[in-house]
Amino acid sequence: MAALQTEPHQRVALVIQYLGTHFHGWQRQLKHRTVQEEIETALERVLGHRVTLHGAGRTDAGVHAAAQVAHFDATGSIPPEKWAAILNSRLPTDILIRASAAVSQNWHARFCAKSRRYRYTLYTDSRPNLFVQPFSWHYYYQPLDESLIEAALQPLLGQHHLAAFHRAGSRRSHSWVEVQAAECYRSGSFVHIEIQANGFLYGMVRLLVGLLVNVGSGELSLDSFTQLWQQERREEVKSAAPARGLCLLRVGYPEFPFPPEVWYDTQPQFVLPSVTDVQKEASQEQQTTSFSDSASPVPHLSCTPVPVPLHK
């Protein structure tokens, strides 16, 4: 009897962008909408059989991704670079495949990754802004000193046992993490905290940011912060930062099959003017413009794209 022939398959890697607001995280879950399930469903409609999508990391409910990486094995003759367009025509508008490419059969989105980089964004203007609300923690209660947060981050560089920032429920057998880079910087009304590591514990970044905000506001001293995580006092890390401010920026590989422009944080961004900038502009126009009646001048809001410096 002739041997049963199986259809050859090719491994395809994807760079994925998604808005986490209406997802219950990355990983497929029963009775909950997830990113993995949406993409697998789209793949199965095209291929006609079950497909497993392997992601580089599992983001929590409400967390965004600018450049998540995943792979799947495809049968048929569809060119790997065509999968991005094919999937985008079938996916909901809160998921975008930025690129697709062929990779070797032993390439794995999770196990070949050497780093993951996250950015947490805090919006510090006292007035709410609906355009930034879904992507930031509106923290205006107390002034934040980003230099204190930066100072608190530096001792974390290197390999450490970070059990203090480990939420219950993780399947990971240890709490060792190699923090490769960490920084805090301000851009107008926004404070950004970026952390890159070989991997992250369950809930680590949000627990860490929740504590760093206490350092930046002066509620917690630098020494107390360092002692807390070095002594693994998990019971004192009580509150996590809101999920909406967290974004998976990029995943690092020794050999990456995509061009650099797939990374979202290398692109110019449109920055909305702050309330202070609008008030200053209105004041200047009032001083320089004469009006024939008593009507108040309307400030001109510029929509010029402002390049945001690349932080690596």
Predicted regions and their residues:
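Structured-RNA-binding interfaces characteristic of tRNA pseudouridine synthases
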Residues: 2-293, 297-312
